[in-house]
């Protein structure tokens, strides 16, 4: 499951404002993206068909949270680009990016928390 750049901006509008009426969505898309009503409804239908959002009785809600969506995107990236190996992904990431001490501590805390759940 992947969103293009424009679809991602559109999805963010919904996630940040849901539940919202389709009329409110049209207004927000005009203000933030300069989209016409027809463009908003076209993209909404496309993302509803993909099971990300739902437009029922003029009320737009998400069928998957932003966090769930990001998790699925991360899993897809690791599976496709790193043959499902999280350590390979982390090694590639840290070879190109310097981690701060806070980030290292946060990652270590996540690992320690996961180890505690396994027992």
Label every PLM stretch briefly:
Residues 75-117:
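Amphipathic alpha-helical dimerization/coiled-coil segments
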Residues 48-58:
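A short, conserved structural fragment
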Residues 16, 31, 48-49, 95:
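The C-terminal cap of the DNA-recognition helix in HTH/winged-HTH DNA-binding domains
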Residues 3-6, 58-77:
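Short, cationic-aromatic polyanion-contact patches
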Residues 7-14:
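Hydrophobic residues on short alpha-helical segments
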Residues 19-29:
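Short acidic, hydrophobic short linear motifs in intrinsically disordered regions
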Residues 3-6, 19, 83:
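Short helix-coil-helix linker/hinge
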Residues 41-45:
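Short, hydrophobic-biased segments on the C-terminal half of alpha helices
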